[in-house]
């Protein structure tokens, strides 16, 4: 691949943060007695139209009717949190995740990630022996945990992935951090993206850091220590111009085979949304064995199965090509990697402005389900060596690919 010094992007305007807007919906009680209310938001979140708390339900004894209420709430609100789930075992977490896609059974990356030493995901995942679809993630030494005798966890740090990291001095003395890598949970090769991801906070250290974008926007915001950041793909779509929406509706994105191995040596932009194009991607001859038939191509817009809304969903760090199906029946292929990255970055960047990013403030016992086909998310924060973070993560490679816009959707644009 030819080397290019950088990725050209349109810099977003600096935003003045003001007080929070009204909640995106009014709290309600479902027919099964579940209480659904908006997540609390900090003052700078003036344009977060998603997120809900769900209470008054026993997840260990979930009826079909109660699950249907949860399913509907998830597809309407994209991220739902069940507080105080301290006694939720991995078996139940897997069972709940599985109910969103009963024909799925394999972990979203196929349980092969920890066998690929040169994958950027390799250090971050440890499978629970009794429930291989559930992963142990976090930071610090964990002993005698659901069949794992002793594991040393490492919270992903932007210094291992960004080209120009924050100095250690700023990080330690000023408590400055960054977005690590904006992504959807997906293998992007051989497997379909999971419908949902579930996360259980077993132990979540508390604190506050300042998250800085460092992308010439001047954007920064306070974030809870180790927060998971979420941005709405629906809002990203809404922010496109009418012409961009028409093109996006006919656009597909092809991903690298073994994408996380391919980009292992490449480095990310400071806001974690995309990559510098410097010719550091591995050549396909250097990858583990792969087959063209297993390379994944997905629509740029993914359709919500309940609301019918369109979300702009892509993993820009791992994209190889853009394919645009023209109205005359031809297909335009964009395979210049810097251009591919520039297009996807500029589509997504307005959607991660501080006013639009929900950073979940994890408390012990929080059980979060997020719609992996409606939001993109990102790790934040940095932990000290003496801090221990323990989370259980579960997502399942879907039995079906994401649905794109229908012909009726495209005709209505």
From Swiss-Prot:
The keyword Metal-binding applies. It is found in: Cytoplasm, Cytosol. Residues 1-18 have a biased composition (Low complexity). GO terms for molecular function: alpha-ketoglutarate-dependent xanthine dioxygenase activity; iron ion binding. Its EC number is 1.14.11.48. Disulfide bonds: none annotated. InterPro entries: TauD-like_sf, TauD/TfdA-like, TfdA_dioxygenase. One of its GO terms (cellular component) is nucleus. Disruption phenotype: Leads to cells defective for the utilization of hypoxanthine or xanthine as nitrogen sources, while being still able to utilize uric acid or allantoic acid. Its cofactor is Fe(2+). Alpha-ketoglutarate-dependent xanthine dioxygenase is a non-heme mononuclear Fe(2+) enzyme that decarboxylates alpha-ketoglutarate to succinate and CO(2) while hydroxylating xanthine to generate uric acid. Allows xanthine utilization as a nitrogen source. Belongs to the TfdA dioxygenase family. This is Alpha-ketoglutarate-dependent xanthine dioxygenase xan1. It comes from Schizosaccharomyces pombe (strain 972 / ATCC 24843) (Fission yeast).
């Amino acid at each position: 691949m030819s080397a290019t010094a950088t990725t050209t992007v349109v810099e977003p305007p600096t935003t003045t943060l003001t007080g929070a807007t009204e909640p995106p919906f009014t709290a309600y009680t479902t027919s099964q007695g579940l209480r659904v209310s908006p997540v609390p938001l900090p003052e700078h979140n003036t344009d977060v139209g998603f997120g809900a708390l769900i209470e008054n339900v026993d997840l260990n004894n979930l009826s079909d009717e109660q699950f249907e209420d949860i399913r509907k709430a998830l597809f309407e609100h994209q991220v739902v949190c069940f507080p105080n789930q301290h006694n939720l075992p991995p078996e139940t977490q897997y069972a709940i995740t599985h109910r969103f896609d009963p024909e799925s059974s394999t972990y979203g990356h196929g349980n092969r990630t920890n066998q690929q030493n040169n994958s950027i995901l390799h250090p971050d995942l440890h499978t629970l022996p009794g429930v291989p679809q559930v992963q142990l993630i976090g930071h610090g030494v964990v002993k005698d945990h659901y069949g794992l005798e002793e594991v040393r966890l490492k919270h992903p740090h932007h210094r291992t992935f960004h080209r120009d990291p924050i100095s250690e001095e700023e990080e330690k003395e000023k408590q400055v951090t960054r977005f690590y890598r904006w992504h959807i949970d997906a293998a992007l090769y051989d497997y379909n993206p999971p419908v949902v991801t579930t996360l259980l906070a077993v132990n979540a250290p508390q604190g506050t850091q300042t998250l800085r974008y460092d992308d010439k926007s001047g954007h920064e915001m306070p974030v809870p220590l180790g927060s998971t950041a979420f941005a709405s793909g629906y809002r990203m779509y809404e922010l496109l111009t009418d012409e961009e929406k028409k093109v996006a509706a006919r656009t597909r994105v092809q991903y690298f085979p073994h994408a996380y191995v391919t980009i292992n040596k490449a480095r990310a932009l400071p806001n974690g949304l995309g990559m510098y194009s410097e010719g550091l991607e591995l050549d396909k001859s250097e990858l583990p064995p792969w087959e063209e038939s297993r390379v994944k191509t997905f629509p740029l817009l993914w359709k919500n199965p309940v609301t019918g809304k369109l979300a702009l969903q892509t993993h820009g760090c791992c994209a190889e090509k853009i394919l645009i199906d023209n109205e005359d029946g031809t297909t335009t292929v964009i395979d210049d990697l810097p251009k591919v990255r520039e297009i996807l970055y500029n589509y997504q960047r307005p959607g991660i402005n501080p006013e639009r990013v929900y950073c979940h403030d994890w408390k012990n016992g929080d059980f979060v389900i997020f719609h992996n086909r409606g939001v993109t998310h990102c790790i934040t924060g940095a932990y000290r060596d003496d801090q221990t973070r323990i989370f259980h993560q579960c997502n399942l490679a879907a039995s079906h690919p994401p649905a794109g816009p229908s012909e009726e959707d495209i005709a209505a644009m």
